[in-house]
């Protein structure tokens, strides 16, 4: 009973705040966000102290290295958070945008405009920057948000929401516009998923277990940020000068994120497979190899079939050798999570066949899978990267946090 009362109260307050946000001008919203960006830079020491507490707890609990990397904040990452907020400020406000306008033969005037979704709940793990990204995107698009982060990042998330609340209080705006769930017990999660009167959409960001639980139990529409089993295919006509830099960047730059490559597919006609595997090993990547690749690099480990559907989020990579593009496409269709697929090739027909045949949120030609990101796509930041097809696919930015309302003005017309 205690859980239900707590959840209903927080949800009700967020819904109430969402109504007041509709009346804020773009100027008012941008002013708040610019102050937030400045405050993030001014209060770095407080943020880092809170994050250090979470990191210490994480080490004591022996959290995986990939999760610890996502949990880590430093001065550079805080600067990146502030930069992302300013990018959001620079973007057009989607609220009020006219998407359709016409006068019907009977004289009725129709105008369709973008309006906020209402209340967005985001349930996420590890990454404190999500608190700022989601808070800023929701606020700019006129939505209240309910933030339920993981227990491992509790203190980091708490201080970031506190900074947001300081500015909202200063500007006379209801702080429930950015609602922080300060209960990390999972018993509080299920009641939130039943708050259909107050919450309009739930966005889960986290491990496969979290996504599955929310998808199965939510009575509220869910936009899934599912796992990223990203495939990168090296065609027989790939340019060797492009291959190693792209593959290394796709896997090594930040292995603990959803747009890092997990499966490397090698055409057996590509002549520099051995050199590529050696380059990956030199970067500290653990290679899980099929028999063909293992014969080129015996220091690797034999791959298991289930490895090809695993999101490692670590310096670990599964390798598959194929004899044709068609075989590569069949493999991708079987293993992909629908997140990101990429091809490296100089053959335009191969590139066209690749992009026309696959069904994922993003398909890349001759570039790193790491580019599948809201900021890189010019969205400022993202609520998540949706692997579903409704209501958004790919990075979920400002415009995707809106729906539409049609306003009809008449002069006494009735329908025959």
Curated annotation (Swiss-Prot):
Q: What keywords appear on the UniProt entry?
A: Amino-acid biosynthesis, Cytoplasm, NADP, Oxidoreductase, Proline biosynthesis
Q: Which GO terms label this protein's molecular function in UniProt?
A: glutamate-5-semialdehyde dehydrogenase activity; NADP binding
Query: What GO cellular-component annotations does this UniProt entry give?
Result: cytoplasm
**Top enzyme class:** oxidoreductase
- The EC number(s) given in the record are 1.2.1.41
PROSITE patterns in the record: PROA
Reactions that this protein is recorded to catalyse: L-glutamate 5-semialdehyde + phosphate + NADP(+) = L-glutamyl 5-phosphate + NADPH + H(+)
The record ties this protein, via SUPFAM superfamilies, to: ALDH-like
InterPro entries to which the protein is assigned, alphabetical: Ald_DH/histidinol_DH (IPR016161), Ald_DH_C (IPR016163), Ald_DH_N (IPR016162), Aldehyde_DH_dom (IPR015590), G-glutamylP_reductase_CS (IPR020593), Glu-5-SA_DH (IPR012134), GPR_dom (IPR000965)
Pathway assigned in UniProt: Amino-acid biosynthesis; L-proline biosynthesis; L-glutamate 5-semialdehyde from L-glutamate: step 2/2
The cellular location(s) given in this protein's UniProt record come to: Cytoplasm
Summarize the protein's role. Answer: Catalyzes the NADPH-dependent reduction of L-glutamate 5-phosphate into L-glutamate 5-semialdehyde and phosphate. The product spontaneously undergoes cyclization to form 1-pyrroline-5-carboxylate.
Annotated family: Belongs to the gamma-glutamyl phosphate reductase family.
Q: Which PANTHER family match?
A: DELTA-1-PYRROLINE-5-CARBOXYLATE SYNTHASE (PTHR11063:SF8), GLUTAMATE SEMIALDEHYDE DEHYDROGENASE (PTHR11063)
HAMAP family per UniProt: ProA
Under which name does UniProt file this protein?
Gamma-glutamyl phosphate reductase
Question: What organism is recorded for this protein?
Answer: Leptospira borgpetersenii serovar Hardjo-bovis (strain JB197)
| Chain's gene name | proA
